Amino acid sequence: MSSYSKLISHPDRPLSRHLSEVDNISSKVLSAKYIQPSFASPDQLEYWRRVLVYFHDFGKSTAFFQYKIIKAIHEENPRKEGIDAAYIDHFYNKNARFELEEALANNSMLGSHAQLGAYVQQSNIREDSMLLRAILLEVVKRHHGNLKNFSEDEFMLDPEQEEVLLEQWGRTDREDYRLIIEAIAFNLPDEMGTLLRSYGGPRFWRKVSRSLPTEDAHPYLLTLFLFSLLLAADKGDMMLQAREGIGRVHLFDSGAVAGFKLQEFGGIPAKPIDHLREKAYQMVEENIRKHPDTPFYSITLPTGLGKTLTAFNAAFQLQNLLAKQYKEKGGATIPRIIYCLPFTSVIDQNAQVLEKIFDRIGIKDGYLARHHYLSDWPGRKEDNEELSDSEKEYFTEGWEYPFTVTTFVQLLETIFSNRNRKLRKFHNLANAIIILDEVQNIPAKYFETVEVMFQALYDYFNTRFIFVTATQPFLISGREVAELTDPTHTQTRAFFTGMDRIRLDLSLWKEGALSLEALILRFQEAMEANRDKSFLIILNKVKASQQVFRELERLNPDAELEYLSAAVLPVLRRERIEKIKNPPEDKQLIVVTTQVVEAGVDIDLDIVYRDLAPLDSINQSAGRCNRNGLKGKGEVRLFKSEKGSGIYDKVLIHITEAVLDRAIERSGGRVIPESDFFTINEDYAKEIRAKIADNNAHSQMIDWMKNLQFEKVNDNFKLIKQHLNHYSVFIDYCEASHGIWQAYEQIIKEVKDRWERKDALRKLRPRLLQYVVQFPQKALPSSYEEDENPIIRLDKTTYPRYYDLKTGYGLFEQPRENESVNI
C-alpha cells in the first residue's frame, strides 16, 4: 500500500493538499476571532472546524468523482502538473472509463460529492445533540450551493437518494482516505447503512424538529458562522496564491483623523459652524473612550456638522480600545471596520475622504475596499503586494480588508440570507465595528428584526455598532445605546437647538394637495421674487419632476437649470452635481430633482421646496439648504403634490403629518425654526416605535430564524424592491459610450470560457453601468420585450425617440395598444 494519498480534488491538486490548505486557512480565520464562550467554547469551535474541513470533500474519494476529475485533467491540465500522473493513467484505462461513463450516464448524481461527506462526518461528531448534527450535516451538504429550510424534505432521504449514497460508499477508496485523516485521529464508519438510517430517516427528523423553534437566534447564527468559515477556507484555497493576507487586520492610528484635519483645515475653526463641528468631534472622542464596552453607539448631529469625519475617528478610537482589551485577554484580535451607507451613489464620495486620510498619514494602498455592485476591486492588499484577479475578488467580497465601505444591502443581506456568495463574508462580522450612516433609511418594518440580530451579534461575536444620523436613532429601542455627542442627551439637544441656518415653512403644505400647474405657478413667483437666490425643487415622481423642469426651463431662459433623477444616466448625474457645486456667478441656479439628492449628495442651495415625504426624508432635503450657515436664513418649504406621496409607506406619511401638525400647535405658526427639529424628530421616533410594536413582519421573520427556515428568511428580507417590469437600457450617445459597448459585445461574442467571460464583464461593469438607466416597461415599445439581451442598447439614431439626455426616459413614450402611459 502506498504511504501517501493519490486521490485528486481539482485538476491541479491532490485531495490531501486541498484539505491541508483548507485546514490551514480556516485555522487562521478562526484564530483571529474572539468568540464569546456563550456561543461555543474554543475547543468546540476548533473541533467542529476540523470535522467540516476533513469531511466536506470526502465524497471526492469515490471512483465516480475521481473519473470526472481525471477526465477534466485531460482537458485542462494535460501535462498533469502537481498530481500523480501514474495514478491518472492507471485510473483512466479503457475498461474503467467505459464502466464509469456508463454509470454516470445512467445516474449523474453518482458524481456528486457533498452529501456523502455530510453523512460520513456524523461518525466523528462527539455531541449527542441532533440539532447540532443537523447543522453540521447541512453545512457540508450545501457547501457548493445555498442553505435550505430545515424541514422533513431536507433531512429525510428518499429511496433513490439512499441508493445513490450506498453505491457511492461502495466505490470509495477508504484506504487511501485514511492516509489523509489518520494523523488527525478521525475515523471512517465500518458501514454506511446504519449512518443513513440514524441521520437520514424519520426518527432523526423527529428529534431535530423537537428542537425547533429554538429559544433564540443562536442555532441560526451558528449555522451561518460555520457555513461561512468553511466557504472562506474552501474558496480561499482555490482563489489565493498566497496565504499571508488571511486573518490579517491593520490597527489604525488613533490620531489619524486629527492629523488629517490639522493638515486639511488648519488648527483654528474658520467659521462659526466650525466651532460646533469641533466641539461635536471632541465630545464623541471623549465619550467613546469612556464607554468601550457598549454594543450600540449613536452619533446624532444636525446635517453639516461633520458626522463623517467624526464617525471615522470614533471607529479608529474604538478599534484601538478593543484591540487593547483583546490583547489583555491573551488574544491578538483587531476589529475590522465596516462602514455602511444606504446608497451606492455616496460610497465613492466617502471612500475618497478615507483615502485622503490614509494618504496624509502615510498609509499605503491595500487597507481600504469599496464593496458594491458598481465598484471595482482594489489591486493591492497590505504591504503593497500585487493581487491576482481571484485574490482581489476573495479579499473584497469576503470583507477581508481592514476597512470596507459598503451598503446597507450588502450588510443586512449577509445576515438575513441563505445565499452561498453572500454568506462567505459572514464570519468577518465577528468582532467588527460596523458604522451605519443615515441608519433611518432601513425600512421601519425591519427595525425590530434588525435590532434583535444586532444584539445577538454583540452577545456572541462582540460586534459593535455605531449609528450615525441627523434624526433620533429609533432603530434601537429598549437597549443600551450610548449617545456619543452626550450620554445625557443634554448637549445632543443643544447641538440642534443652537442651529439657526434654516426654517421649515409648512404654509404651502397646509393648503392641501396641489396640481403641478398650481405648483409651477408658486415656484415661478418665488423665483421671480428672489432672483439672487438659488432654488432646489424636490418632487417624488420622475414624471412630475420632468414636467416641472421643462416648464421652468421655458419660463426662465436666463437661469442656469439642472435636472437630476434616476432617469438620468449616472455619468451625466455626476457631471451635473459638479456643476451645481460650482454654479456660474451671473445666473440664478434652479435645480429640479427627485429624492436622489437625499443620498448624501453634497450640494448647498438657498431655498428648498420638498414634496411631502416621511420626516427623515424631509430632514435629508433640509440638509441641502444653507449647510454652512453662510447665506443668512435658508428656507425649506414643504408642499403636497397631487398623488405625489403615493410612493411612500402610508403609515410613515400619516405619522409625519401628525408630527408636523403638533409642531405647528406648539409654535403657534406655520414656520418651524431649525432649533425645534430635535423635538420634532424625537416625536417622530416615538410614533414610529409605537406603530411597529405589533409588527407581524418582525414576528414572522424571527419565527423563521428560530425554525432555521433559511430560504424563507432570504426570500422575505428585501431592502430593495425588485422592479421586474423594468429594462436595463444602455444609451449609446457618444464616442466614450460606443467604445464601452463595443468592448461589451466583444466579450459576449468572443470569450467562450464562462469564468473568463464573467471576470471580463465584472471588470467592464463599473464603466458600462455609467451609461445604463432603468426604463419602466411602458417607456419602450412592446417589441423590446422580445430582446433576450440583459441590457438593451439604444444607439445614436434610436435613443432620441425614447430618451432625452436632459430629463431621461418618459417624454417620448408611445402608448401600447389599449394602454395609457403613467409613470
Give the label of every model feature segment:
Residues 126-127, 132, 458, 517-532, ...:
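C-terminal helicase lobe and adjacent C-terminal extensions/tails of nucleic-acid helicase motors
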Residues 3-259:
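Accessory nucleic-acid engagement/destabilization modules that flank
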Residues 422-433, 440-495:
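Post-DEXD/H (motif II) to motif III coupling segment of the RecA-like Helicase ATP-binding lobe
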Residues 470-526:
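Interdomain hinge/linker at the junction between the two RecA-like core domains of SF2 helicases
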Residues 292-315:
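Walker A/P-loop
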Residues 360-416:
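Inter-Walker segment of RecA-like/P-loop motor cores
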Residues 369-381, 540-543, 561-577, 592-598:
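Conserved helicase motor
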Residues 333-358, 372-375, 542:
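Conserved Walker A/P-loop ATP-binding site and its immediately adjacent core
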